[in-house]
UniProtKB/Swiss-Prot annotation:
Keyword Nucleotide-binding among record annotations: yes
Catalytic activity: ATP + H2O + polyamine-[polyamine-binding protein]Side 1 = ADP + phosphate + polyamineSide 2 + [polyamine-binding protein]Side 1
GO molecular function: ABC-type putrescine transporter activity; ATP binding; ATP hydrolysis activity
Cellular compartment(s): Cell inner membrane
Membrane topology: Peripheral membrane protein
PROSITE patterns: ABC_TRANSPORTER_1 (PS00211), ABC_TRANSPORTER_2 (PS50893), POTA (PS51305)
Protein name: Spermidine/putrescine import ATP-binding protein PotA
Organism: Protochlamydia amoebophila (strain UWE25)
SUPFAM superfamilies named in the record: MOP-like, P-loop containing nucleoside triphosphate hydrolases
Keywords annotated in UniProt: ATP-binding, Cell inner membrane, Cell membrane, Membrane, Nucleotide-binding, Translocase, Transport
Cellular-component GO terms for this entry: ATP-binding cassette (ABC) transporter complex
Binding site for ATP: 37-44
InterPro entries (UniProt xref): AAA+_ATPase, ABC_SmlMolc_Importer, ABC_transporter-like_ATP-bd, ABC_transporter-like_CS, Mo/tungstate-bd_C_term_dom, P-loop_NTPase, PotA-like, PotA_ATP-bd
Family under the similarity heading: Belongs to the ABC transporter superfamily. Spermidine/putrescine importer (TC 3.A.1.11.1) family.
Length: 373
């Protein structure tokens, strides 16, 4: 028996709109798993199908080997935390957490034990007597999580639970969610459109786009080894190049002719031939910048350019560097700051460089007219 959740060929339409298109993947038991994508990608629909609030048009859902596709929502060992908290304003925090236990007709001794345990888990033992309007937004979210966990579900669904919180509070709640997950050990499924949230807490991430699964992997795989242009662009910033394979070097690397730009060496894990049209990506933080000319090493990309944009962002400075017909984004991290160090300025002539391992071929493009042969 496979432990965890399995989606098998799940499809869903609303009128003429395709919400999910033949989606298949598995979530391991006990994982902190994120469904990530822009609005309308299908992530919330997938969550609602798992919760039992929607039925798929095709496909099925397995939980620990059992088909739960037709099981009513109230029969599934799954609880959901929503963005709006949905706390009862007339009940205390203690009573809000106890509500589900009372519905289940648990004994008062058991209710007291479970509620006190949950208050300890969310670090709010001293707030049990308060009403929801007497606590902060972050505390309300923790109470909503405790209320969802008190009945010991096998799966907790989190539907954009941090969207209403400010930045600092979201960062604090992410740490709380990670800690709570580690302590309770059940499967958490986290829906978000915020890449940084998913990257911070997830064991694995499923990236969805227009109802289809683009990629699934751990945060490092998703960021460093995107499988498509959409994933590379949605997860952080990147520079894209279209070109043709001119030659292969040492099997793992290709030299690519790029229109309006010098040739680029890049990592290649695909079966490509000379003349193939390809799509390349290199992250701005992988590119180095200097006023001094750099001696190019084998398989290193070194180019001269002119600074067109300079934007100071605190922990790093963003540069737009004009090289040939292209403007290249470069992010220089600030490992130290010296008052007497002359900063790179607008219209400065600079050198930028990156190793071929830091640029990668995402996919083949449709055949372009190649005048380089």
């Amino acid at each position: 028996m496979v432990e965890g959740i399995v989606f098998e060929h799940v499809s869903k339409k609303f009128a003429d709109s395709i919400a999910l298109n033949d989606v298949s993947f598995a979530i391991n038991k006990g994982e902190f798993f994120s469904l990530l994508g822009p609005s309308g990608c299908g992530k919330t629909t997938l969550l609602r199908i798992l919760a039992g609030f929607e039925k798929p048009d095709q496909g099925r859902i397995l939980l620990d080997g059992q088909d739960i596709t037709k099981l009513p929502a109230n029969k599934r060992p799954i609880n959901t935390v929503f963005q709006n908290y949905a706390l009862f304003p007339h009940l205390t925090i203690w009573e809000n957490i106890a509500f589900g236990l009372r519905i289940a007709q648990r004994s008062e001794t058991e209710i007291k034990r479970e509620v006190e345990q949950m208050l300890g888990l969310i670090q709010m033992k001293e707030h049990g007597h308060k009403k929801p309007d007497q606590i902060s937004g972050g505390q309300k979210q923790r109470v909503a999580i405790a209320r969802a966990l008190v009945n010991h579900p096998r799966i907790l669904l989190l539907d954009e639970p941090l969207a209403a919180l400010d930045l600092k509070l979201r960062q604090k709640m992410l740490l709380d969610l990670d800690r709570i997950h580690d302590e309770v050990g059940i499967t958490f499924i986290f829906v978000t459109h915020d890449q940084s949230e998913a990257m911070a807490v997830s064991d694995r991430i499923a990236v969805l786009h227009k109802g289809s699964l683009e990629q699934i992997g751990n945060p490092i795989e998703i960021y460093e080894m995107p499988k498509s242009s959409f994933v590379a662009d949605f997860i952080g910033d990147t520079n894209f190049f279209d070109g043709w394979v001119k030659e292969t070097a040492q099997k793992e690397y290709s030299l690519v002719d790029v229109e309006g730009f010098p040739q680029i060496y890049c990592f290649n894990d695909k079966q490509l031939s000379k003349g193939d049209a390809v799509h390349l990506s290199v992250r701005p933080e992988k590119i180095h910048i200097s006023r001094e000319q750099i001696q190019a090493h084998p398989l290193q990309n070194v180019f001269q350019g002119i600074v067109d944009d300079v934007i100071y962002k605190g922990d790093h400075t963003h540069f737009g560097i004009q090289v040939g017909d292209r403007k290249i984004s470069v992010n220089q991290q600030h490992s130290r700051f010296l008052l007497d160090e002359a900063p790179i300025k607008w219209k400065d002539v600079v050198w930028i460089w990156w190793h071929s391992d830091d640029g990668f071929i995402l996919e083949r493009c449709q055949k372009l007219e190649n005048n380089n042969e």
